[in-house]
Amino acid sequence: MAEMRPGPLVGKQLNELPDHSPLLQPGLAELRRRVQEAGVPQTPQPLTDAFLLRFLRARDFDLDLAWRLMKNYYKWRAECPELSADLRPRSILGLLKAGYHGVLRSRDSTGSRVLIYRIAYWDPKVFTAYDVFRVSLITSELIVQEVETQRNGVKAIFDLEGWQVSHAFQITPSVAKKIAAVLTDSFPLKVRGIHLINEPVIFHAVFSMIKPFLTEKIKDRIHLHGNNYKSSMLQHFPDILPREYGGKEFSMEDICQEWTNFIMKSEDYLSSISETIQ
């Protein structure tokens, strides 16, 4: 029997329903059936409604796209244990304490979570590119539990001030491909925007290596702001940025410390999902 697929409007309407809505059950039942029949290797996370809804919402309840995303998620985790097998925060605590990463206190006007990464606080002699990417994966696994984030996705700001050749050497073609996989179709979060600021000339070689692995949709959502970025950034993120980037209410140090505390409080959960797929 031909399977009915919701059109864009229906999918977006389903996206706004609460987890307990009976209207979500047909999609949940079908996605669960596909996973069980395919015998896909399981992650440590059981096939609860909440877990399956991440994939359905990430693809606006298009079952075929959600199923493809889920298969890619399992495949990526199995093939990249150096990234996904150990999500315990103590492995990257030095990066967090250095102030490499923070999450803004408020969402943007579209409801997206906004994440900030500062390359100057990554010492490539101490932490590898895999360590750095694990920071992003840890945050992603935490915020993907939020229903509003499932609906409205994330936007990332990368401050590339301090980017050096030693950083570039860490981003091999293999690493670039793995990073691109998560940005495109291997993790159940909608990437709504990527904003690069203070990008030096030597960064463009690395960007050129990653770009071929990205979808056209993701490419269209990448914004290069350069060194004179404050006015353009404030247009994208009015009233929610830290002082270092044109805001007024709080500093990067504040939000880095707050997010580090939140990650450490989530250590038990992160440990529980850190086992490698069997």
Swiss-Prot record:
(+)-alpha-tocopherol binds at residue 187. Its main location: cytoplasm. It is found in: Cytoplasm. GO terms for cellular component: cytoplasm. Residues 88-253 form the CRAL-TRIO domain. Changing residue 59 to W: Abolishes binding to phosphatidylinositol 3,4-bisphosphate and phosphatidylinositol 4,5-bisphosphate. A 1,2-diacyl-sn-glycero-3-phospho-(1D-myo-inositol-4,5-bisphosphate) binds at residues 208-211. A 1,2-diacyl-sn-glycero-3-phospho-(1D-myo-inositol-3,4-bisphosphate) binds at residues 185, 190-192, 217, 221. Binds (+)-alpha-tocopherol, enhances its transfer between separate membranes, and stimulates its release from liver cells. Binds both phosphatidylinositol 3,4-bisphosphate and phosphatidylinositol 4,5-bisphosphate; the resulting conformation change is important for the release of the bound alpha-tocopherol. This is Alpha-tocopherol transfer protein. Monomer and homotetramer. Phosphatidylinositol 4,5-bisphosphate binding induces the formation of homotetramers. Phosphatidylinositol 3,4-bisphosphate is less efficient in inducing tetramerization. GO terms for molecular function: lipid transfer activity; phosphatidylinositol-3,4-bisphosphate binding; phosphatidylinositol-4,5-bisphosphate binding; vitamin E binding. The gene is Ttpa. The keyword Membrane does not apply. Keywords: Cytoplasm, Lipid-binding, Transport. Pfam families: CRAL_TRIO (PF00650), CRAL_TRIO_N (PF03765). Changing residue 217 to A: Loss of tocopherol secretion (in vivo). No effect on tocopherol binding and intermembrane transfer (in vitro). One of its GO terms (biological process) is positive regulation of amyloid-beta clearance. It comes from Mus musculus.
